[in-house]
Regions:
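A broad, low-specificity signal for short, low-complexity segments enriched in glycine/proline
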Residues: 27-35, 68, 80, 84
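Short helix-loop boundary/capping segments at the starts of domains
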Residues: 53, 72, 76-80, 89-93
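Intrinsically disordered, low-complexity, charged terminal extensions of DNA damage-control enzymes
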Residues: 1-62
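Catalytic cores of DNA base-excision repair glycosylases
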Residues: 87-196
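Glycine-/proline-rich flexible loop or hinge segments
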Residues: 62-70, 102-106
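A short secondary-structure junction motif
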Residues: 68-79, 83, 109-116, 169
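Alpha-helix initiation and N-capping motif
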Residues: 30-31, 41-44, 80, 178, ...
Length: 196
């Protein structure tokens, strides 16, 4: 439980790299979780008081979330939002069928690398063919879901963890290798290096 809320409160340091139009869903936590953390760590308690409640947007659609996270790898939030807007404009709705119907070159023309376009196309093809049961991932444990997502081209542990957090709202994910989380922990605890 501690890990879940460390992420919530340290996420203020991480820039939001996606925003979904329309009715927003937010990562859910309450006073019980906040009070638990405050009792466990004085520095975190101070940060919680300074930052206050954080509304962290979630992705509503699992397929679109996976595609969005592949698109957003190693680019700025602004660039990711631009590419995503172009993708939505071209496809109308980002679904396995609409992505599967597009060529990698067409996807690349929207501003992503050809490699990312191929990853997204491969992912959509696996969904359409039934080779990858996307909805079944929701029923897996965190580690099983990370392994399932990581079996796809273009998705490593970090991307899988982001999908679990920002779409599936898994409470016990701390993407320890995330540079922004590392930076946030160093700032909060005044350490040069953070280890597990």
């Amino acid at each position: 439980m501690l890990i879940r809320y460390y992420f919530c409160f340290l996420s203020v340091i991480i820039s939001l790299y996606f925003q979904k139009a329309g009715a927003a869903m937010f990562f859910q936590y309450g006073e019980k979780e906040i009070n638990y953390l405050k009792r466990k760590d004085k520095k975190l308690a101070w940060a919680i008081e300074q930052i206050g409640h954080i509304e962290r947007r979630l992705d509503a659609d699992l397929f679109a979330s996976v595609v969005r996270h592949i698109v957003g790898q190693q680019i700025s939030s602004k660039a990711q939002a631009t590419v995503w807007a172009r993708l939505e404009a071209r496809l109308s709705v980002v679904t396995p069928a609409s992505v599967h119907a597009a060529s990698p070159e067409e996807l690349q023309s929207l501003g992503m690398s050809l490699r990312k376009a191929e990853y997204i196309k491969d992912f959509a093809s696996k969904i359409v063919s039934g080779e990858f049961a996307l909805q079944a991932v929701e029923q897996l444990s965190d580690e099983e879901a990370i392994a399932a997502f990581s079996s796809l081209k273009g998705i490593g542990r970090w991307t899988a963890e982001m999908i679990l957090l920002f779409c599936l709202q898994r409470p016990d994910i701390l993407s320890f290798d995330d540079l922004a989380i590392q930076r946030g922990l160093r700032m909060l605890y005044h350490h040069r290096k953070i280890t597990r």
